[in-house]
């Protein structure tokens, strides 16, 4: 790549759930803009992160994991991921380096796309025998004409700088679209709601994380500089309310405390966070609610 040529482009990060797509985006951007957990299907929306390079700018798009659809919400998530295959300059297909060789993923997702695709083998730090990595790279290369196959660890950062440098070589010429101090085009209210939802994913189990949506009802800055936020945790069934609140309110307090810590880091100021719980029965199957919560 010629260093004196300005570059700008869109790069979509796609793959199955729980392969480290959001962790990779956060690592590239250098800040937490996409939530993560050890549960699949944590990401529900397309998340854009903006990375500036010496001679240009890259907009990376994190996407929901591609999975079987069991609800309107799931379908909307997969539709968002598949939409991210279009109108971009490059695709990064992220897979678990130690996982199965997923020929169906390649066939269903990449079949017919004319966009250049790089394969990103993530979590290589978890492979005890590096010879396995070479075997996996060879096996994947038989499935699709990937432009590059790049082993990385989004968690530790291993190989990520090299990935960014390689991506730059595939960008078209162009001028930056965003100011160089912008990390994402997402509104703060959206990121705040996501940070609360992340804590629910990390602290609760079974169906609770998947039955939860979060909406920020108010967001105001007080004269003393404290930001006061009121957010609703929306559940699908009345019997879930006691679980999210917990004994003597302990679970709700824990969610709020951990979320407030992240929100204060995001906003750079003290935060007063009020959480309350309400029931929106079967919201994941109701088109009106999916639109209200930003999932359609």
Swiss-Prot record:
Residues 15-22 are annotated as: G1. Its main location: cytoplasm. InterPro entries: G_ERA_dom, GTP-bd, GTPase_Era-like, KH_dom-like_a/b, KH_dom_type_2, KH_sf_prok-type, P-loop_NTPase, Small_GTP-bd. Belongs to the TRAFAC class TrmE-Era-EngA-EngB-Septin-like GTPase superfamily. Era GTPase family. It is a peripheral membrane protein. The keyword NAD does not apply. Residues 7-173 form the Era-type G domain. Residues 41-45 are annotated as: G2. The keyword GTP-binding applies. It is found in: Cytoplasm; Cell inner membrane. GO terms for biological process: ribosomal small subunit assembly. Monomer. One of its GO terms (cellular component) is cytosol. Residues 152-154 are annotated as: G5. Keywords: Cell inner membrane, Cell membrane, Cytoplasm, GTP-binding, Membrane, Nucleotide-binding, Ribosome biogenesis, RNA-binding, rRNA-binding. It comes from Pelobacter propionicus (strain DSM 2379 / NBRC 103807 / OttBd1). GTP binds at residues 15-22, 62-66, 122-125. CDD domains: Era, KH-II_Era. This is GTPase Era. Residues 62-65 are annotated as: G3. Residues 204-281 form the KH type-2 domain. Residues 122-125 are annotated as: G4. GO terms for molecular function: GTP binding; GTPase activity; ribosomal small subunit binding; small ribosomal subunit rRNA binding. The gene is era.
